């Protein structure tokens, strides 16, 4: 068997920075003198989350958190997805030291939403339940709606201000597929005369998808490695399926399907929240047969 890796795969810079930040803090906190928390799951990867838990890192339930809780002398890390400004204020009031590991690209989208909500309506494209979009929406201060696909963009009720020739801006979830975003923008342009579209898709997403498409020409089957709850991994897997090559989505080496061993050349790619050691383990197990 031959195993070929996509030219671009695994951790993106934003996720790597967030993980490295927490790992460094955990190593400095070996005597557990103060609590170390992440506000919500740091990344959508079960293996990494288990490793962090074993190092004493705890996860705060974002939905049930209140500023009344006492986190004095603790450290709370904001994950790469970011959080709304109101939540950040609550964290600071809890007495904890707050470390912001929000991805720089998400911060840029937050700034766009804040700036343009003063004069226009903000429309976000992507998963309405995703932490990133929830964080960005918080900066639009109520002048915002989220559309998840082109069909929704064509039918969703728009505020009266837009019906009266008002202006709007469109901001994408950083992990959305370019084709999905273009379709949403096209549908909205037919309904909003003054719509400014910002390209806020992270190159890490499109780079992984492009590398996967290129890899598909060189292999017999594809394995996509990543958390099944990860938005970018699910989109990467859909790209693999679209190549028409046999494709599987796995979280780690234990999930490698038996069927894969009937193929001679296997292509490997991984989502932006998949650590290097998991990719290495999958490749090793494939080569061992």
Curated annotation (Swiss-Prot):
Q: Where does [4Fe-4S] cluster bind?
A: 12, 103, 202
Q: Which reaction does it catalyse?
A: isopentenyl diphosphate + 2 oxidized [2Fe-2S]-[ferredoxin] + H2O = (2E)-4-hydroxy-3-methylbut-2-enyl diphosphate + 2 reduced [2Fe-2S]-[ferredoxin] + 2 H(+); dimethylallyl diphosphate + 2 oxidized [2Fe-2S]-[ferredoxin] + H2O = (2E)-4-hydroxy-3-methylbut-2-enyl diphosphate + 2 reduced [2Fe-2S]-[ferredoxin] + 2 H(+)
Which GO terms are recorded in the biological process aspect for this UniProt protein?
Answer: dimethylallyl diphosphate biosynthetic process; isopentenyl diphosphate biosynthetic process, methylerythritol 4-phosphate pathway; terpenoid biosynthetic process
Q: Which UniProt keywords apply?
A: 4Fe-4S, Iron, Iron-sulfur, Isoprene biosynthesis, Metal-binding, Oxidoreductase
Signal peptide start-end: none
Do you know which CDD domains this protein is assigned to?
lytB_ispH (cd13944)
UniProt keyword Iron-sulfur present: yes
Q: Which molecular-function annotations from GO does this UniProt entry contain?
A: 4 iron, 4 sulfur cluster binding; 4-hydroxy-3-methylbut-2-enyl diphosphate reductase activity; metal ion binding
For the protein in the UniProt heading, the enzyme class is oxidoreductase
Q: Which residues bind isopentenyl diphosphate?
A: 44, 81, 130, 230, 232, 273
| Annotated dimethylallyl diphosphate binding sites | 44, 81, 130, 230, 232, 273
The record's free-text note on cofactor binding: Binds 1 [4Fe-4S] cluster per subunit.
Indicate which residues the UniProt annotation says bind (2E)-4-hydroxy-3-methylbut-2-enyl diphosphate.
Answer: 44, 81, 130, 174, 230, 232, 273
Which Pfam families does the entry mention? LYTB
Known pathway: Isoprenoid biosynthesis; dimethylallyl diphosphate biosynthesis; dimethylallyl diphosphate from (2E)-4-hydroxy-3-methylbutenyl diphosphate: step 1/1; Isoprenoid biosynthesis; isopentenyl diphosphate biosynthesis via DXP pathway; isopentenyl diphosphate from 1-deoxy-D-xylulose 5-phosphate: step 6/6
Q: Which residues cross the membrane?
A: none
Disulfide bond sites: none
Q: Which residues form the active site?
A: 132
Q: Which cofactor does it need?
A: [4Fe-4S] cluster
Its function, per the record, reads: Catalyzes the conversion of 1-hydroxy-2-methyl-2-(E)-butenyl 4-diphosphate (HMBPP) into a mixture of isopentenyl diphosphate (IPP) and dimethylallyl diphosphate (DMAPP). Acts in the terminal step of the DOXP/MEP pathway for isoprenoid precursor biosynthesis.
The family this protein is said to belong to: Belongs to the IspH family.
User: What is this protein's name?
Assistant: 4-hydroxy-3-methylbut-2-enyl diphosphate reductase
